[in-house]
Design a protein with these regions (language model features):
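Basic nucleic-acid-binding interfaces
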Residues: 1-141
Length: 141
């Protein structure tokens, strides 16, 4: 029996980083995205965010490429959200996304980080947070 795990911290942002996912209705978006991820045979460990972006910790199935999963999440949830009363100002997702490979040993720390998004963003903008993530990963901003 094969056993694999590819763990990714994925970040997607709204079009033009506009605050179009209200806190009061964000759980509807999270549930819809959770269903997409589950339907792709991937495991969602945590999802959370604020009005202009979402963080996900995902165990990627060996049957799907990371870029295909992100595309399916963005396309499916965008089409759905535009039809919902919960997101009257939602126009879609931005073109870019971040996906950072993670060690299973860091899973709990990343879940904690995702859980505390509202706290992080009292002190840091999305742009600052994203730049920090890119630099910590050894990539260029």
């Amino acid at each position: 029996m094969s056993a694999t795990i590819s763990l990714f911290h994925i970040v997607i942002n709204t079009l033009r980083r506009e605050m179009t996912i209200p806190d009061e209705t964000s759980e509807h978006m999270y549930r819809y995205i959770t269903a997409i991820i589950k339907n792709k045979d991937c495991k969602l460990f945590r999802i959370n965010g604020i009005g202009n972006h979402i963080h996900m910790l995902v165990g990627l199935s060996s049957s799907i490429a990371l870029s295909d999963l992100v595309r399916d999440i963005k396309q499916g949830s965008s089409k759905w959200a535009k039809q919902q009363v919960y997101f009257p100002n939602f126009r879609g997702w931005g073109k870019e996304y971040g996906a950072f490979s993670c060690s299973i040993r860091d899973k709990d720390a990343i879940i904690n980080y995702i859980n505390n998004q509202r706290v992080h963003h009292r002190q840091k903008s999305f742009e600052q947070e994203y730049q920090d993530m890119i630099e910590r990963s050894g990539l260029e901003w």
